[in-house]
Amino acid sequence: MQIRYLGHSAFEITDGKWNLLIDPFITGNPACPVKAEELHPQYILVTHLHDDHVGDTVAIAKRTGATVITSFEGGQALAAQGVKVADMALGGKRRFDFGLVRVTLAFHGFGPTGGHACGFVIHIGGKRIYHAGDTALFSDMKLLNGVIEEPGIDVAMLPIGDNYTMGPEDAAVAVEWIRPKVVIPMHWGTFPVLVQDASGFAARVRETGASQPVVLRPGETYTL
């Protein structure tokens, strides 16, 4: 299984059969190395409707026929634009043909429709991948460490950009709580206000021994 970082909070997950996109902010993303037309997902997961997360969702979904997994409010807004939607809500789980999705809490605004921002735990290919979305640090993250997700998270994507989300210090605390096998920092460096030292974050995580940090540059891939 491969996880390709597309810059900001956008990721592509492929396992040889399924192709998933998360928060596909492609067009207008100065860090993204690909064009939206190059992506061919079967599913798109959207954590909230801020432009830097919903991004090219509608255009990609219309072109490929992908199903968009998002919140109820976001689903209504996207369905009105002719997109096929599977809407969910905080705390919910749902099985899809590729695996299972759990919708997790995220402390952040949602966008023009209102509703709740979220994160996702994606079960695919025998792995559990947590994309936190845009969020502050919150103590319920501890539940992902073997409580509601047993035996725990294989890969966590956590924002470290600060200002709009938690910064590297709080993200390092999140890693200690979640204790994923691998952590990939996201939502950093895209714009001047998000400039951070990802290598410093990685060093902090290594010191704690809570996870293996993997800092991906846009376009790079991590293989599970």
Swiss-Prot record:
Belongs to the UPF0173 family. The lineage of its organism: Bacteria, Bacillati, Bacillota, Clostridia, Eubacteriales. It comes from Symbiobacterium thermophilum (strain DSM 24528 / JCM 14929 / IAM 14863 / T). InterPro entries: Metallo-B-lactamas, RibonucZ/Hydroxyglut_hydro, UPF0173, UPF0173_UPF0282_UlaG_hydrolase. Pfam families: Lactamase_B_3 (PF13483). HAMAP family: UPF0173. This is UPF0173 metal-dependent hydrolase STH3160. GO terms for molecular function: hydrolase activity. Keywords: Hydrolase.
